[in-house]
Amino acid sequence: MLRSLKALKLNSLNAQKGIRQFCSDSKISGQVIGIDLGTTNSCVAVMQGAEARVLENAEGGRTTPSVVAFTEDNQKIVGLPAKRQMVTNAENTLFATKRLIGRRFDDPMTKKDMTMVPYKIVKGPNGDAWFEVKGKMISPSEAGAMVLQKMKETAETNLGGPVTDAVITVPAYFDDSQRQATRDAGTIAGLKVQRIINEPTAAALAYGFKKDEPKTVAVYDLGGGTFDISILEIVGGVFEVRATNGDTFLGGEDFDNALLEHFVAEFKKEKGIDLTKDTMATQRLREAAEKAKCELSSTLTTEINLPYISAGPSGPVHFNMKLTRSKFEQLVADLIQRTIGPCNICLKDAGLSTSEINEVILVGGMTRMPKVQELAKSTFNKEPFKGVNPDEAVAVGAAIQGGVLKGDTKGIVLVDVTPLSLGIETLGGVFTRLIKKNTNIPASKTDTFSTAADGQSEVEIKVFQGEREMAVDNKLLAKFTLFGLPPLPKGVPQIEVTFDIDVNGMLQVIAKDKATGKAQQVRIQTSGGLSKDDIARILKESEANAEVDRKRKELVEARNNGESVVYQVEKDLVEFKDYLSQPQTEEIKKAVQAVRDVLAKEDGSAIEAEIKKLHDLTRSSFETAYKAKLDSSASKSSSTENKENKDNTTEAEFTEKK
C-alpha cells in the first residue's frame, strides 16, 4: 500500500503545448474517414474538398443499423439485412453491443442488460462481458469491429479504393477501458485509428465548422444507448471543451424497453398470456416499440397491430393497441428526467450559468422527441438549435477532424478533456486523484508517494477512474507491482507515480523509485479486455473469414450471372428459332443445361467456365442468326415497298394531237 506525500512536481501540459501535440501527427497519405460507431445506428463520412460528405451504404441508407447476425449456415450479416431477420433469429442477432464494450460481467449495468436482450451475455476469459452465439464466444470489441468493417466497406465502395485510416467517436463519458476497447475494435476491423474523439465534441465541430462568431455551446447528446452533455467554447477555430458529463447506460434502447414492458404487461392483463416466454413474439413487440417511439415524435397517437402474436385455447391471438404521445411520455418520464442531473453538474464544473450558454445543440436520434426538446429548453432556458442532423452530425465532425489530421483542413483545433478523475489507491483505501475530471488532454502529472509499512520491498499500485472518495467504489483500470525497493522505514522511500493521458484519452502509468531508479510502467488496456495476442488471433480469424466471405460472394455472383445468361440465351433461342439450324439449337440447349446443372454446385469457377463455353458457342450462332433476321426483315420491307409502289402507280392521261 502506498502512502501519499506532498506532491513534488506537477507536469500538467498547458493548453498551447496540448494544441501543438494535438496537431503534430505525421502526414497521412490516404483518405481519413470519420465513423460514428453508434449503439443503434452507425454513420461514416469523409472530407471531399472543403465539405464533409456522408456516405451511403449498399442499401442506400446514410446510417447503418449496428446489428450483427449469424445465420443457420454460420454466415455473418451486418447492418440492415441483419436487422430485417431479427424476428426469426433473435438469439443469434447482436444489437446494442456498444453498451457492453469495456464492461465487466459483474457490472450492475451488465446484469440489467441481460434481462433486456434475447442473446446470451456470458463471462469472458478475463471477467468481462462477452456474447455467446452458436457456441462461439464473441467480445464486444469483435462485434463492434464487424460493424466498423461494414462502415469501412461502405467508404471503400463510395471512394473507389482501399481505406485504412479513421477517426472513431465514443461517448464523452466513456472511461479508459471503454475507449481502449473501441480502439481494439478499429484495429480488428483493419483500420488505423488515428484518433478517438468524443461524440459531443465531434457534433460541436460539425456545428461550428466555418463559423467565425465566438460562442459557448452546450451539446445535449441523447442517442441509442448513451447520454452526454458537453460545454465548449468555440473561438477562432479552437474548440475547447470546458466540461463534460453523462450516463453511459441511458438512451433510445431504454425508451424501447419501457414501451416493450408496457406492451407485455397490458397484453398479459387483457389476454392472460405472457409474451416474454416467446422469443419471436418479444422481438416483434420490440420492433413495434421502436416504430411507435419514432412515430410519436411527429404524431399524437399511433396504433400497434401485430396479427397472430400468440395462440390461445380458441385459436390465434392478435395484438392491437392504441398509444398516445402523452402515455408514452408518462412511461419514459423518469428516463428523460435522468438527463437533468448531468446537465447541472456539467454547468457547475464549467463554472457557467445557463445565461452564459449561447446555443444548445441537440444531437442523437432521441432528441427528435418533443418532450426531450422541452426538457433541454427548460434546463438551459433557451430554445435548442436543431440545425444539425442529429443522426449524422457526429460522423461529419469526425470526418472534419480526419481532414485536420491529414492536413487538408486548416485552422481547426480541438482541446478535449478527460471525463473522469484518474488516480491510485493509497493507505486506508482512499482514492487519491492525480488527474482530475475535465482536465484538458493531453496531460501529464507526477506525484510522490511512500511506503505504508516498515521494510516494504515492493508496492502494488492500483489505478482507478471515477469520482468516489474510496477507491473500491470507483472502476479499477489496472494494477501492477514495483519490486526491488530497499527495506527502509515506512515513509522514507520516495516513489514517483506519473500519469500520462494522450489525446485519445488513454492512460499510461509509470512508477519509479527515486533512490534506485527502478521503474515499472503499464499502458492501460481494458481490464477484462483483449490482449495483443487476442487481437492478433481475431485478426487472423477475420482474414480467414474474409477469404470464406470472398469465395461465398464470388459463388453468389457466379450463380446470378449464370441465371441471367441462361435467361437471355433461352429468350434469344425463341427470337431466332427460324434462323438457327436444328443441330445449332440442340447444341445450344445442351450447353444451357450444362450451366443449369453446375449452378447447384458450390464451385464459382466451374460455373464461370460453363458460362464461358455457352458464350463462345452462342456468340457466332446468334450473330449469324441476327444478321439473317435483319436481311430477312430488309427483304420483306423492300418487297412490301415495291408492291405498294406498284399499287400506287396510275396511268398518265394524254391527248393525241391531230
Curated annotation (Swiss-Prot):
Does the UniProt entry include the keyword Cell wall biogenesis/degradation?
no
Q: Where is this region: Disordered?
A: 629-658
* Sorted UniProt keywords: ATP-binding, Chaperone, Mitochondrion, Nucleotide-binding, Transit peptide
Q: Which PROSITE patterns match?
A: HSP70_1, HSP70_2, HSP70_3
InterPro entries from the xrefs? ATPase_NBD, Chaperone_DnaK, Heat_shock_70_CS, HSP70_C_sf, HSP70_peptide-bd_sf, Hsp_70_fam
Q: Where in the cell is it found?
A: Mitochondrion
Q: Does the keyword Membrane apply?
A: no
Output one GO MF annotation: ATP binding
Low complexity bias locations: 631-640
Write one Pfam family the protein is assigned to: HSP70
- Record GO biological process: chaperone cofactor-dependent protein refolding; iron-sulfur cluster assembly; protein refolding
Question: In terms of domain of life, where is this protein from?
Answer: Eukaryota
Disulfide bonds, paired cysteine numbers:
none
Its main subcellular localisation, reduced to a broad class, is: mitochondrion
Where composition is biased (Basic and acidic residues), the residues are 641-658
Q: Describe the family membership recorded for this protein in Swiss-Prot or TrEMBL.
A: Belongs to the heat shock protein 70 family.
The family database entries (PANTHER family) matched by this protein are listed as: HEAT SHOCK PROTEIN 70KDA (PTHR19375)
Q: What is this protein called?
A: Heat shock 70 kDa protein, mitochondrial
Annotated organism of origin: Dictyostelium discoideum
Gene label: mhsp70
